[in-house]
A protein has these predicted regions:
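Core alpha/beta structural scaffold of self-assembling particle/tube/pore-forming proteins
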Residues: 1-59, 67, 71-413
């Protein structure tokens, strides 16, 4: 019998090809824009006055007429409460010891976990800075009956129109927020389930999506899924700031005198329509008119699917030019403002933002907790070590009227 790879298998070696390969999208456009306007703050909460109304004690009169009644300027107080983000790792002593050195492993376990957590924190924040404080990942579909089950039909949340599983992966621990009522913060929210672990997530052939939990879970139609403990604890996002209703930073947008606290929203009642240059210009002009600044929009941001729609508008006349960013990257523009695209952005939506009006308030920047002099701590009764990252602060705009959001844009995912 001739020698073959089968008979010689015990002698053959594996040839290892260097470092760990990255396959995850690490682009964090919104985080980079926000972090460029970061501010160090402190105290119980952030407070600043906002001028929302003029003194209208003016008018013309006849000779010797009674002077206008004295009025006053109108101010409101905006408040920003801090939020607290954490990222935690744990590595066994065996994994640490057995991964030391290039000959033992592709990467040392503790260094790899700490480095990946640092990157993951940026990616987590990037998603959060779009979708905001409620922490939506997806919702239970309308055809899901209210039962104890392990397999749950899901659909996109109202702020995550499109693929409902793009922020879900196996191993996540989720809470289900009750969709009924008018919850606006942690004190008013109720849950349909808590701390359920995702075993798998599947997109079916028909486009239906399911999440399979590791144990039976009580679900109802419309339940909003978030990472456990994160409901209304996430940092505020641009969807919170670029809105025209509700209360933002303690100021009611419903009050007529506070209309300058409303952002510019161009929707189509939930029906998608083609993107046009005229639609973009309408939104641009709305923000310019509301703010009194012709070039108030500094960036437009959208999902990659909308980039294709935008390029289709420009290609027939070859009217697009690309700006060059640091590192040589090229970006499109509209009216001279950068038009940026990334995977975490909501589908079917274009944001127009005034970057100087947005602030990433930092009480504590991203850091590994080491008040006791060590980043790592022993886990009680186990030969294992753990550490955690943290960042305290919040995110928001002090001029919502300088920003716009176009929704219901037709785009192929």
């Amino acid at each position: 019998m001739p020698a073959t790879t089968t008979t010689f298998d015990a002698v053959l070696k594996d040839w290892f090809l260097g470092k760990v390969r990255d396959t995850l999208n690490e682009k964090v456009t919104m985080f980079e824009i926000a972090n460029a306007k970061a501010e160090r703050v402190g105290g119980r909460r952030l407070v600043y006055p906002v001028h929302v109304g003029r003194n209208f004690g003016v008018g013309t009169r006849a000779e010797r007429g009674t002077l206008p009644t004295a009025q006053n300027e109108v101010y409101v107080t905006a408040t920003v409460s801090p939020k607290y983000w954490y990222g935690r790792i744990e590595v066994s002593a065996q994994a640490m010891k057995q991964s030391q050195g290039d000959r033992a492993a592709f990467a040392e376990a503790m260094s790899e976990e700490m480095d990946r957590m640092t990157r993951n924190s940026r990616k987590y924040f990037n998603r959060m800075l779009y979708f905001g404080s409620r922490g939506d990942l997806c919702t239970v579909a309308s055809d899901q009956s209210s039962v104890n089950t392990t397999t749950v039909n899901v659909t996109s949340s109202t702020v995550n129109v499109g693929s409902p599983l793009r922020f879900i992966q196996a191993g996540m621990i989720l809470d289900g927020l009750n969709a009924s009522g008018a919850a606006t913060d942690t004190s008013t929210v109720s849950t349909d389930f808590t701390s359920s672990t995702v075993a798998s997530a599947t997109v079916g052939a028909s486009g239906s999506s399911t999440i399979t939990f590791s144990a039976t879970t009580t679900v109802v139609s419309g339940t909003i899924m978030t990472l456990t403990g994160c409901g209304y604890n996430d940092f505020n996002g641009i969807d919170d700031g670029i809105d025209s209703s509700g209360t933002y930073q303690g100021v009611s947008r419903a009050a007529y005198q506070n209309k300058s606290w409303r952002a510019n929203i161009l929707g189509n009642s939930g029906t998608n329509r083609p993107l046009t240059l005229n639609l973009l210009q309408q939104a641009w002009d709305a923000a310019s008119e509301a703010s009194g600044e012709d070039d108030t929009t500094t960036h437009l941001i959208s999902h990659y699917s909308v980039r294709r729609e935008y390029l289709d508008l420009l290609t027939p006349d070859v009217r697009f030019t690309a700006q060059t960013l640091k590192g040589g990257h090229k970006v499109l523009d509209f009216n001279g403002a950068q038009f940026r695209f990334e995977v975490d952005a909501p589908f079917n939506t274009v944001y127009g933002i005034n970057a100087p009006s947005w602030h990433l308030y930092k009480i504590s920047d991203f850091e590994w907790a080491d008040e006791d002099g060590s980043v790592l701590s022993r886990v009680s009764n186990i030969d294992s070590f753990e550490g955690f990252m943290r960042m305290f602060g919040n995110f928001g705009t002090d001029a919502p009227n300088k920003n716009f959001r176009i929704t219901d844009i037709q785009a192929t995912l």
